[in-house]
């Protein structure tokens, strides 16, 4: 995942003023039939051409770097100027709570039948009432099996590393995933709201900081390839980028568990092109189109015929691609924390400020 997860409406609203002008000028004046906002590289580069060939409709794809960026724009404009938006599940949950997303017309999205049953039973949106999952996966440990001489099977392998690993480990910088490692190591929920338990996790992570090479959301896999790092916290698909370059890089979900992250697609309530937007969602859920994400960004997609169409060699090379939906579904979904997000943000600020 290339996204940031400081998941609060308050923060999104705080960003809104700064980006209000951008949101309206970048999208509202567009003459395309649809404006789609997504992370860069998260869809095929020829998506506009292929969608037009299939439907006769034109689209403009605009990119957001983080969930917070697009949330600020959406809050500033109340979603006007955008038709379809890709956001991570806690943000989809926030948008739905704010009344900003359109209920999905399943009759207009026949390819929704391609989703695994588990993908239609996600707790934040059972039945896919207002969102469809685009990609999903786990967060775990990515390591150099040729260099690490101790077992890697627990979050404590990272948080309390062997002496030989000190200064050779990295953790994700983003609030939710950084805190998740500490919470899971203590047997707590990744959505924990008890301030005392959040404080415990914070203290674990302050101690772990003393052993780290860096906090790193974007280059940890290249550090593994070079050997600068030997053990890192990683999203499963990003670990695959390292595995592609070095067969000694391995991925494991720690015995204490993982979060289940989901990136979703929503249609904005204030879209003036809802019928066309539903056609776009259906187009993405076509098995061939959805398989592109698995083949090219190496994340699992929750689309049964799409996954079944993949070369079996992918599952042999990349462990996450072999995970069944049932295996993924046993991990805990990241949820919107509401007012408790401020406790996470405060804890992370204190962790990063600690010596």
Question: Model regions: which residues?
Answer:
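A ligand-binding cleft/hinge motif common to bilobed small-molecule-binding domains
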Residues: 91-94, 225, 231-248
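Mature extracytoplasmic/periplasmic domains
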Residues: 268-328
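Ligand-binding "clamshell"
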Residues: 96-103, 125-128, 241-253, 315-319
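Conserved C-terminal helix/tail region of periplasmic/extracytoplasmic solute-binding proteins
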Residues: 222, 325-355
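Extracytoplasmic ligand-binding site segments that recognize negatively charged/polar headgroups
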Residues: 81-82, 86-211, 216-228
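A bilobed periplasmic-binding-protein/Venus flytrap-type ligand-binding module shared by bacterial periplasmic
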Residues: 142-147, 183-187, 262-273, 292
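Periplasmic-binding protein-like
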Residues: 198-207, 243-269
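Early extracytoplasmic/lumenal segment of secretory-pathway proteins
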Residues: 32-94
């Amino acid at each position: 995942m290339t996204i940031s997860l400081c998941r609060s409406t308050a923060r999104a609203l705080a960003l809104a003023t700064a980006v209000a002008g951008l949101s309206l000028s970048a999208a509202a004046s567009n003459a395309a039939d649809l404006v789609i906002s997504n992370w860069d590289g998260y869809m095929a580069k020829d998506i506009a051409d292929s969608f037009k060939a299939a439907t006769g409709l034109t689209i403009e794809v605009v990119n957001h770097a983080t969930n917070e960026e697009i949330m600020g724009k959406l809050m500033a404009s109340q979603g006007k100027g955008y038709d379809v938006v890709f956001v991570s599940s806690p943000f989809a949950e926030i948008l739905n709570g704010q009344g900003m997303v359109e209920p999905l017309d399943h009759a207009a999205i026949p390819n929704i039948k391609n989703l695994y049953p588990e993908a239609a039973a996600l707790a934040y949106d059972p039945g896919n009432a207002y969102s469809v999952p685009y990609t999903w996966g786990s967060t775990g440990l990515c390591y150099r099996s040729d260099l690490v001489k101790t077992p890697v099977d627990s979050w404590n392998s990272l948080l309390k590393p062997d002496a030989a690993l000190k200064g050779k480990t990295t953790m994700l910088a983003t609030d939710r995933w950084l805190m998740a490692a500490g919470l899971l190591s203590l047997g707590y929920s990744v959505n924990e709201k008890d301030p005392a338990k959040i404080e415990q996790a914070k203290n674990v992570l302050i101690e772990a900081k003393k052993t780290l090479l860096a906090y790193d959301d974007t280059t940890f896999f290249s550090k593994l390839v070079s050997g600068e790092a030997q053990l890192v916290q990683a999203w499963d698909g990003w670990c695959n980028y390292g595995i592609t370059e070095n067969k000694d890089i391995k991925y494991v979900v720690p015995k204490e568990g993982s979060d289940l992250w989901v990136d979703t697609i929503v249609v904005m309530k204030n879209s003036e092109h809802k019928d066309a937007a539903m056609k776009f969602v259906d187009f993405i859920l076509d098995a061939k189109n959805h398989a592109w994400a698995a083949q090219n960004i190496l994340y699992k997609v929750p689309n049964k015929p799409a996954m079944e169409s993949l070369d079996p060699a992918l599952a042999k090379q990349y462990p996450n691609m072999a995970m069944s939906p049932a295996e993924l579904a046993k991990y805990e979904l990241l949820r919107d924390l509401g007012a408790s997000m401020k406790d996470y943000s405060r804890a992370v600020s204190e962790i990063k400020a600690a010596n």
